[in-house]
Amino acid sequence: RLISAAENHPEVYAKVSDEIEKKAAANKAPVLGITGTGGSGKSSMVDELIRRFLIDQPDKTIGVISVDPSKRKTGGALLGDRIRMNSIRGERIYMRSLATRQSNLALSKHVQKAVDILKAAGFDLIVLETSGIGQSDTEILDHSDVSLYIMTPEFGAATQLEKIDMLDFADVVAV
């Protein structure tokens, strides 16, 4: 409900934002930012990471924020990332989809508030998945401690790799 308040009712969220920010600052949970081109397998990778995390860390919790693009023509968003995620059920996981609410963006303008809310709630790991990005988008770096760039092997000519900014900044690249 707090994430919805941050998105839709800023006046309500403003009443609790200071407390949330204090609690979020006290939680040193890492934020894993996952980004890549549309259709590269970001949601499938998130699902696999969640599955392994839940097995390997039986006492830990994970919060997932998944951002999907809003269509320019209709303003709507499919929020379909969860279709690929089979491991998002259970008491130790929370998954929330957000729409970019604008075209040509990889993240929602409310994503940092959502991350802070999950940190304040005490999650041990937070995964932030962007919608598909273009060659010059590195916005995920502003919201994550560790960044993972996912790409397909069909990237075109080798010179295309030189144009992908995330290859210069990502902590991990998965093909």
Language model: regions and residue ranges:
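Walker A/P-loop
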Residues: 43
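Short, charged, surface-exposed secondary-structure boundary motifs
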Residues: 156-162
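Nucleotide-state-sensitive switch-loop elements of NTP-binding domains
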Residues: 4-29, 40, 49-155
